[in-house]
């Protein structure tokens, strides 16, 4: 779990996302509160529940990007899902409890990676012995092994091919579901799980010494880990630090004056209620309590309104954050300021062909102006419009770059207008092309 202060979290998000200070503040406080809660004594810790967040804002302003960057920062099990993927319990499709099962799987991978680092040194030695067995045989003399060990560590044998025995990963046993079993979609029931490893099925692989390194270290690390303890730790991490980002929540709103049942809408909202409020979900690894999992929901709400959500669901998302539509200045900053801005990406891509791309300041102004103009006349899709405009402007350069190695291509305002100006002015054409 990260122990960044809210100010540090915001400054980290600022490296990649332009504007939206309110949303950044809200998620940074929520993330810090996770850490604060863990510092409390056990009795009070149980009572402090997370304040779930609802982010409201037009498409393309940074809601999903905030979630993506937060996931990398959090150092906690994090899952981003679209609310539209789920159906009401009892219908064909995924029910919302699958969110928690997926979150547990994410946590298990995270905990395993962390624990592998703790046993890396021992695993490295065991893996080295297995490589030497493959190279010179298990019964070779100590002198021979030492000679090959020195060559191995010096990297002289990296390209040599060897045969290694590795654990067969799944695929050998069919999966089946037990009808009527609650949560039968727990990833189904594997016959391999029921009968154990059946003597540990292995397969022989032919790989180079260099590529065998990671395979064998991972396998030897797993032998040194206690899987049951690892799973219990992962469940504990999910229950205390888990974060779920529910995107497109506005798409499961039931709008006023709509009649008739809708499998993927109100029923999904009703199923989400206990999950967000706090319930116990059965997974194949054990029961998981959701009381302290943080839920961040987001939606554009350009057709539905937040008030169209079930009142109970609104009450379970107490913190509301409104993200602002992007202005021309925001568009300009998005093109230049983030660490991996669009301009930097295109310059780097062209450099691989030996072409130097020189995009002037007035070209950046023109690109921002066109993106804002098209957004206002056609459909406001926010910063995503910049990608469409950039692709259109640089289409000719991208196509011919491989024939222009060593050249410098200058893109100024006149170049931008020449390649896209007329399209942007013609609303009917830009509706289909930009």
Swiss-Prot record:
Matches recorded under Pfam families: AAA, AAA_2, ClpB_D2-small
Cross-referenced InterPro entries: AAA+_ATPase, ATP-dep_Clp_protease_ClpX, ATPase_AAA_core, Clp_ATPase_C, HslU, P-loop_NTPase
GO CC terms in record: HslUV protease complex
Quaternary organization: A double ring-shaped homohexamer of HslV is capped on each side by a ring-shaped HslU homohexamer. The assembly of the HslU/HslV complex is dependent on binding of ATP.
Keywords, comma-separated and alphabetical: ATP-binding, Chaperone, Cytoplasm, Nucleotide-binding
Molecular function GO labels: ATP binding; ATP hydrolysis activity; peptidase activity; proteasome-activating activity
Name assigned to this protein: ATP-dependent protease ATPase subunit HslU
Subcellular location: Cytoplasm
